[in-house]
């Protein structure tokens, strides 16, 4: 059976030499033309629509049709939405408990950073190291505060026999304003390496020590009370008798003011200035390098009182500006 050409106005037999198979039909090569304009086409530039060949300009364009929003269409859309929600919720229930998705925000970033810092502190043992440092830290010395014992006036006969109460409490000074014993050791505070003073080996410089003028009220009153003041070397030389004083200066009389016992149990010691110091307060004294300061009394770890031999001024001075000095044995008249 011979094959016929698919073109309607041709209808002739198609031989194998001129045969063209396309769109499920057999065509003559010269009969394979555009249905609208009649332009000859080939296998590269044709477009088929409804099993008919078309060129590109005349190819029927598919345009989306506009459908009215009817109740039926609304019902279909609602069903589609419900089906989508059901499927999504089923997936959500399936994934529940397996993982949690959390969005990163500043608060979460801060918590993650804090957790990382805590983990590093625990891993490196910072807390244990601080605890060990606190264990080896020297404990503060807290002097006991017994019942204050008033000091009776002393004369030259009873000077060599101090009372047992004063000898037992060698680290106490007495203040008439506070009515009893006052501990000279202040509360130590933890400082930095910049506050360490290498001269006295204590924490805190001389300028940083608390100045308590009330502690000096009784000492200054006793020194300024008598018309003549004497100091002995810190070796503990006994005070002179009244006869020797009257023979040296017949017009001067030795009164018997209340004596102040130093924390070391002696009548004062002498020091020598190794630096210049300018008084920063009214209860301090100024001195130059090389000055001899006598009749010294220790107030606390950083301060003491004494009299400068050169200027005869009495007051407070920093302990890290002086060093112990040995005076010749004997009596030295200051005023």
UniProtKB/Swiss-Prot annotation:
Listed PROSITE patterns: LIM_DOMAIN_2 (PS50023), NEBULIN (PS51216), SH3 (PS50002)
Domain SH3: 266-327
Nebulin repeat placement: 66-97, 98-132
Annotated Basic and acidic residues bias: 128-142
GO terms for MF: actin filament binding; metal ion binding
Chain intervals with Low complexity compositional bias: 242-260
Keyword Repeat: yes
Gene3D superfamilies registered for this protein in UniProt: Cysteine Rich Protein, SH3 Domains
InterPro entries per record: LIM-SH3_domain_protein, Nebulin_repeat, SH3-like_dom_sf, SH3_domain, Znf_LIM
Keywords, sorted A to Z: LIM domain, Metal-binding, Repeat, SH3 domain, Zinc
Cleavable signal peptide: none
Assigned GO CC terms: cell junction; focal adhesion; striated muscle dense body
Region Disordered: start-end pairs: 128-151, 233-264
Domain LIM zinc-binding span(s) in chain numbering: 5-65
PANTHER family named among the record's database cross-references: LASP (PTHR46218), LIM AND SH3 DOMAIN PROTEIN LASP (PTHR46218:SF4)
Protein name, entry field: LIM and SH3 domain protein F42H10.3
Organism from which the protein derives: Caenorhabditis elegans
């Amino acid at each position: 059976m011979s094959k016929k050409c698919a073109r309607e106005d041709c209808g002739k037999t198609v031989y194998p030499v001129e045969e063209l198979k396309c769109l499920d039909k057999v065509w003559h090569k010269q009969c394979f033309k555009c249905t609208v304009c009649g332009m000859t086409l080939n296998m590269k530039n044709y477009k088929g629509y409804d099993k008919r060949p078309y060129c590109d300009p005349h190819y029927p364009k598919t345009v989306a049709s506009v459908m009215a929003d009817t109740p039926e269409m609304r019902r279909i859309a609602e069903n589609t939405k419900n089906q989508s929600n059901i499927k999504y919720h089923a997936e959500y229930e399936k994934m529940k408990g397996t993982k949690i998705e959390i969005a990163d925000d500043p608060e979460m970033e801060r918590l993650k950073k804090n957790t990382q810092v805590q983990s590093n502190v625990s891993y490196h043992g910072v807390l244990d190291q601080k605890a060990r440092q606190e264990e080896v830290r020297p404990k503060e010395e807290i002097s006991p505060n017994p019942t204050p014992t008033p000091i009776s006036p002393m004369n030259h006969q009873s000077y060599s026999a101090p009372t047992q109460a004063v000898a037992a409490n060698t680290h106490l000074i007495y203040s008439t304003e506070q009515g009893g014993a006052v501990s000279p050791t202040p509360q130590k505070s933890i400082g930095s390496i910049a506050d360490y003073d290498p001269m006295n080996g204590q924490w805190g410089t001389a300028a940083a020590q608390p100045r308590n003028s009330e502690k000096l009220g009784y000492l200054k009153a006793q020194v300024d009370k008598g018309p003549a003041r004497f100091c002995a070397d810190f070796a503990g030389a006994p005070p002179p008798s009244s006869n020797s004083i009257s023979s040296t200066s017949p017009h001067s009389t030795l009164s018997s003011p209340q004596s102040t016992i130093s924390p070391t149990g002696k009548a004062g010691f002498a020091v020598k200035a190794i630096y210049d110091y300018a008084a920063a307060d009214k209860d301090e004294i100024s001195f130059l390098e090389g000055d001899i300061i006598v009749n010294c009394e220790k107030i606390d770890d950083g301060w003491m009182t004494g009299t400068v031999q050169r200027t005869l001024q009495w007051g407070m001075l920093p302990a890290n500006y002086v060093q112990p000095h040995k005076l010749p044995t004997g009596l030295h008249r200051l005023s």
